[in-house]
């Protein structure tokens, strides 16, 4: 299987803190790859580097086999990478449609082509099982529905590599089930997914591969049995 994303020896330092030390991982195309570790281990930092929000102090990033150095999220988005943040970045007083197309509005005759946007959003919603009402104000949506809007935002921009940063932190159990169903659907459509979490039970439910980060260092990125992973994490915590 081809490799969608490869990080080689990524390091990142802040004043007095080593956030990432020699972190490497490979994400296969069409898989869910979990990035696991305790709070403060450096999981989100390495993904912010991949997304262009921060620059690494060392290491290489390869996307679909091509070495890339992202200077901003715009460059990462252009390369087909999207990030669903833990804290949603939505305008409450805008509709679902307006939020999804914001900054990437289709135009016709120098005006926003809302008809074309609506058609595209409805098609994506059905294709990926992310049903939304394009005309509903975001302020009227529940947390799980808002997350769907965030996912559709990155898909609308052409992402085929999706980063989910602690996506279940604000969800109730039913919404977690719905999210995992959506993740499986995205994977079946060939999307590559990076799932950041510190919740082991959720990782075992959704992930095909796992990379463990402890105290800023990557300890394993190979495909392994779920039982092996559980034992390893439990032993290292003692």
Task: Report the location of each language-model feature.
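Glycine-rich phosphate-binding loops of nucleotide-dependent enzymes
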Residues: 1-217, 221
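Single conserved hydrophobic/aromatic residue that forms the stacking wall/gate
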Residues: 218-238
């Amino acid at each position: 299987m081809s490799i969608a994303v490869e990080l080689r020896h990524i390091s990142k330092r802040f004043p007095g803190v080593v956030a990432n030390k020699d972190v490497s991982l490979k994400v296969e195309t069409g898989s869910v790859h979990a990035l696991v570790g305790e709070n403060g281990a450096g999981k989100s930092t390495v993904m912010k580097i991949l997304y262009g929000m921060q620059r690494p102090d060392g290491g290489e990033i390869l996307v679909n086999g091509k070495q890339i150095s992202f200077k901003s999220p715009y460059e990462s988005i252009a390369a087909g990478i999207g990030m669903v943040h833990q804290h949603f970045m939505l305008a409450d007083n805008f509709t679902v449609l307006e939020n999804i197309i914001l900054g990437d509005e289709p135009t016709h005759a120098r005006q926003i082509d809302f008809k074309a946007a609506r058609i595209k959003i409805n098609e994506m919603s059905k294709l990926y099982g992310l049903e939304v009402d394009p005309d509903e104000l975001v302020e009227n949506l529940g947390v799980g529905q808002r997350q769907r809007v965030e996912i559709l935002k990155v898909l609308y921009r052409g992402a085929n590599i999706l980063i989910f940063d602690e996506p279940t932190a604000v969800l109730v159990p039913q919404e977690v089930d719905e999210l995992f169903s959506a993740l499986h659907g995205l994977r079946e459509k060939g999307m590559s997914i990076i799932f950041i979490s510190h919740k082991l039970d959720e990782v075992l439910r959704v992930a095909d591969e796992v990379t463990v980060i402890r105290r800023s260092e990557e300890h394993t990125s190979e495909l392994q049995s779920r039982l092996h992973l559980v034992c390893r994490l439990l032993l290292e915590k003692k």
